Design a protein with these regions (language model features):
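C-terminal capping/extension of enzyme domains
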Residues: 1-16, 91-108, 137-200
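Short acidic (Asp/Glu) patches
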Residues: 14-20, 57-69, 101-107
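Short hydrophobic segments within beta-strands
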Residues: 32-35, 83, 122-123, 167
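Short glycine-/acidic-enriched loop or helix-start segments at secondary-structure transitions
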Residues: 42-45, 131-133, 176
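Short, surface-exposed acidic-centric catalytic microdomains
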Residues: 48-98
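Internal catalytic-core helix/loop-beta-alpha segment
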Residues: 77-133
Length: 200
């Protein structure tokens, strides 16, 4: 299945959105990592060029977690799909609530494409907000408590039978400088990978 084509069929007007143009067997995906927002240049996204800006921070995190990867395909082959909550590049420093809301229908449909997901990682506050907006529509409450990620790290959060792991943003060169967040995000990736391996 091509994710972009599938979402275009399901959602209709996707003209101004950046959707993942990647072929996947949805049944093989056991974990989804939701990053915050698509980059301004499509080539810098996870499924852009092999040495894209987003992969330049993602690969070191996986390796720190003890998962040897070199390309996004290596991550997909391990049953892990990466996407962005907001499908349009940000126009200012912060991601606006409106841009999160505009992308929600597409993110919701995208998540529903994968029937065997056991873990969803929320990489940063925008991903957490977007996921809570989705859960509020279906369950009338937030899936993830609105407290700092640091305080949630050792809390087991389950939503519709799926383990939810709030973590830190995985893109942008700052993450390589902020050693503590890099370490914690890598530990969270390690936890996610253990959970999907244990369920095999």
């Amino acid at each position: 299945m091509n994710i972009k084509s599938e979402l275009q069929q399901l959602c209709g007007d996707t003209q101004n959105l950046r959707l993942n143009d990647v072929n996947i067997e949805p049944e093989t995906i056991q974990a989804i990592m939701i990053n915050e927002v698509v980059p301004s240049c499509p080539e810098d996204d996870f499924y852009g060029k092999p040495d894209s800006a987003y992969m330049s921070t993602t690969i070191p995190m996986f390796r720190k977690a003890g998962i040897e990867v070199g390309l996004v395909q290596d991550i997909l082959n391990r049953g892990i799909y990466i996407t962005n909550a907001v499908k349009t590049p940000k126009s200012e420093y912060a991601v606006s609530k409106e841009s999160i809301e505009n992308s929600l229908p597409y993110l919701g449909k995208e998540l529903a494409l994968f029937p065997n997901v056991k873990v969803i990682m929320l990489m940063g506050d925008v991903a957490k907000k977007a996921f809570n907006m989705i859960s509020k529509k279906t369950t009338k409450k937030n899936a993830v408590p609105s407290i700092s990620t640091y305080k949630l790290r050792n809390t087991e959060i389950i939503y519709k039978g799926i383990r939810i792991i709030p973590s830190y943003i995985m893109t942008g060169q700052n993450i390589l400088i902020e050693k503590s967040k890099f370490e914690m995000a890598s530990e969270d990736i390690e936890t996610m990978y253990r959970l999907i391996k244990d369920s095999d």
